[in-house]
Regions:
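Long extracytoplasmic/lumenal interhelical loops at the membrane interface
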Residues: 305-342, 365
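Alpha-helical transmembrane segments
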Residues: 18-25, 82-83
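Hydrophobic alpha-helical transmembrane segments of multi-pass inner membrane proteins, especially
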Residues: 64-293, 333-391, 418, 422, ...
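Membrane-interface helix-loop junction between the first two transmembrane segments
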Residues: 22-40
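Hydrophobic transmembrane alpha-helical segments in integral membrane proteins
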Residues: 1-17
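Transmembrane alpha-helices of multi-pass inner-membrane enzymes
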Residues: 394-439
């Protein structure tokens, strides 16, 4: 009987994910506010049904009360987040809140399957981060001088990134983690936020070519530090963020293509100079020839995805423990093995819809600084997804980058929630600017109408 229930649940989980994914895009269509609110309310239902099915399956396999308690804690947490946040910030982006909860939920489910202790730790970090970062939208909305500290951001970010040379520890071959008084964190996760602020602040004020040269040199120093740390994923991420922000700020395609050419040249040089780059490329080209050594991660990742096929083995029925670093860097492989490739594709589209929300806010923002902030964080979010999933599927060399909100990692979760709350603040600002613009437009129309009537009366 339990086997029948879990088999039915396996397909219902995929269906719920499909419906939620479709709703992420249909919510963009309706102009009617009530209709849009109904769609968003339905999204919440789909998410909770998905969570219920997953934890029902996990409970039926283990029969441990702690699983039900953990599920109940998540329901309370998500309910509070989705009810209280919109009441505090009436102009917030509800689709972004729903996506935040869904992605966190997927992460909690797969982590519960892999390690209940890690799932609990991730939940505690996420809950604490939501509380601590909840004031950020208010700060973004009320404080109007964020664009005045460009050089301060540049110096502060560079110094924080450089702490690895003093307190750095080796993790998976890279010195991009810091340990201070027993507390371990990844500085580059927080510095990328400061980096986007620094670039947006200075590019929004740049008037001459020499200004762009100065900004580019500082940005290049950030990338160089990451290369020295052997954080290849971070270096590539920062490079792409800067290049896209530079292109949008200047609207010059020559900078974009010039940057791509310079980046390609740098990649070729890095492949010739750095041994760790050569190893990553060799593993990417033919991981099966190194299956007993450095190629094991990628090989097991591909085996897991292939084993899961379209519909997955079912939650709890796969062999994700064969995948190295399954809780963080290679979590997408574990998801595809248990839930199936269809679920994995849906997850990618949900992540894509969040990026679209970022870009929508960017296009509606009237101030260049706000526009560049949204763009920078959007590119950061999407490219991080690309690096993570591209690496585990052998589309690109593995870079050790995690999926935002889904993969295990306290630093990653905190930094992503900070970014999402900054975007919420920018969304509120964009709405205020639109209302102000419409009001001014209405006032001008009324004045013009009055003048025309006065002329007729004369």
């Amino acid at each position: 009987m339990i086997d029948i229930i879990t088999t039915i649940a396996k397909y219902l989980i995929i269906i719920m994910c499909l419906i939620y994914t479709l709703s992420c895009y249909t919510v963009f269509r309706p102009k009617n506010k009530d209709r849009k609110e109904d769609l968003l309310d339905n999204q919440v239902i789909y998410m909770f049904v998905f969570l219920f099915l997953c934890y029902m399956v996990l409970f039926l396999q283990e029969f441990e009360l702690k699983i039900l308690i953990f599920f109940a804690a998540q329901v309370i947490f998500f309910e509070i987040l989705m009810i209280v946040f919109p009441r505090i910030y009436k102009r917030c982006s509800r689709p972004l809140i729903n996506n935040t909860c869904f992605l966190l939920g997927v992460g909690f489910v797969i982590l519960t399957r892999l390690s209940f202790d890690l799932a609990m730790k991730q939940f505690a970090i996420a809950a604490g981060s939501v509380i601590v970062t909840s004031f950020i939208p208010l700060m973004m909305h009320k404080i109007t001088i964020w664009n005045k500290f460009g050089w301060l951001y540049a110096v502060a970010g560079f110094l924080l990134l450089s702490t690895v040379f003093v307190f750095g520890i080796n993790k998976y071959g890279a010195y991009n983690w810091v340990s201070i008084a027993g507390l371990k964190f990844q500085p580059s996760e927080f510095v990328k936020i400061i980096f986007v602020f620094f670039v947006a602040a200075l590019l929004s004020k740049a008037k001459e070519f020499k200004d762009l040269v100065k900004i580019t040199v500082i940005a290049a120093l950030y990338v160089l530090v990451l290369v020295v740390e052997k954080d290849l994923g971070g270096a590539l991420l920062y490079f792409v963020i800067y290049l896209m922000m530079l292109y949008v700020a200047t609207a010059k395609a020559s900078y974009l293509f010039g940057g791509l050419a310079a980046g390609s040249l740098a990649a070729i040089i890095a492949d010739k100079i750095f041994t760790h780059v050569q190893i990553r490329v060799a593993v990417w080209k033919d991981p099966f020839s190194m299956i007993e050594g450095r190629g094991l991660q990628v090989c097991q990742s591909l085996f897991a995805i292939g084993t899961g096929s379209w519909f997955g083995m079912g939650l709890g029925n796969g062999r994700p423990f064969d995948i190295p670093v399954r809780e963080s860097d290679f979590i997408f492989s574990a998801i595809c093995e248990e839930f199936g490739v269809i679920f994995g594709i849906c997850l990618i589209f949900v992540l894509m819809s969040s990026f679209i929300l970022f870009m929508d806010i960017s296009t509606r923002s009237r101030k260049l600084f706000n526009k560049l902030l949204c763009l920078g964080f959007g590119v950061c979010f999407l490219f991080q997804v690309f690096l993570s999933i591209g690496g585990v599927t052998k589309f690109i060399p593995s870079t050790g980058v995690t999926i935002p909100l889904v993969s295990y990692g306290g630093t990653s979760v905190i930094s992503t929630l900070i970014i999402f709350n900054i975007i919420q603040g920018l969304h509120m600002l964009a709405d205020s600017e639109e209302e102000e613009y419409e009001y001014i437009k209405a006032q001008e129309s009324e004045k013009q109408y009055t003048r025309q009537n006065n002329r007729k009366n004369q």
